[in-house]
Amino acid sequence: MVERLDGVFKSISDFLRQELNGKNAVIGVSSGIDSALVLTILSKAIDKDRIHAFFMPDRFTRSADFDDIRSLEGSTGVKINEINIENIVNGYKSTLGINDKKYEGNIRSRVRSVILYYNANLLNGLVVGTTNRTEYLIGYFTKYGDGACDLEPIEHLYKSDVRELASYLKVPESIIRKKPSAGLWGDQYDEDELGMGYEELDSILKDLFEKKTGILDDRYKMVYDMYIRSQHKRKLPKSMMNDDFRYNV
């Protein structure tokens, strides 16, 4: 197991070094396990002075999250900059008349993306994403919010893989044990919103996309429907231009 996990760590490190190609890394950290893992790998893969990490709390951020951010600073040796987004979000809410928690949650995610890309412009950096494979396949991310980035180093890892690698790389235990939450509104937890835990989700996704079992029961259909409904999040905008021109010169 150690050899396998070390191989995963080294391949992600190589990917980051190659794709950053000397540029700075800009990353948003939430005190959750995914961003903590990516920051930990970055801290071992490139010089720490090239890493610009941002914690963007709001009124829903729990006191324990601030403690975990300090622990993450200690374990990685990377300074994490704090920018409170509540006043920015309130400006959007008052201007647009937003009174739905899900719409407001998407605004919060997109405000964080704006801050990251502003700093990427300022610092000659690339935004490093933190979406895992489980979230990616079911579309559990905000389009042009936390889904907006230049590199996705852990998108090939299921949530269970993330936990395993985080433990191997000694991410703070309080972060690993924490109940997953996007923190987009009060008392929001991933597994409550999704209707099942990540362990079950990972098992079903592996059956559907790797073992090709097909839909075996209602739980499988529920997960497959999440995948179908979120396909637009995984595609580039439709265009009348031939796709060859997007990538070839």
Curated annotation (Swiss-Prot):
GO terms for biological process: NAD biosynthetic process. Pathway: Cofactor biosynthesis; NAD(+) biosynthesis; NAD(+) from deamido-NAD(+) (ammonia route): step 1/1. The keyword Magnesium applies. Its EC number is 6.3.1.5. It catalyses: deamido-NAD(+) + NH4(+) + ATP = AMP + diphosphate + NAD(+) + H(+). GO terms for molecular function: ATP binding; glutaminase activity; metal ion binding; NAD+ synthase (glutamine-hydrolyzing) activity; NAD+ synthase activity. Deamido-NAD(+) binds at residues 110, 143, 150, 232-233. NCBIfam families: nadE, PRK13980.1. Belongs to the NAD synthetase family. Homodimer. This is NH(3)-dependent NAD(+) synthetase. It comes from Picrophilus torridus (strain ATCC 700027 / DSM 9790 / JCM 10055 / NBRC 100828 / KAW 2/3). The lineage of its organism: Archaea, Methanobacteriati, Thermoplasmatota, Thermoplasmata, Thermoplasmatales.
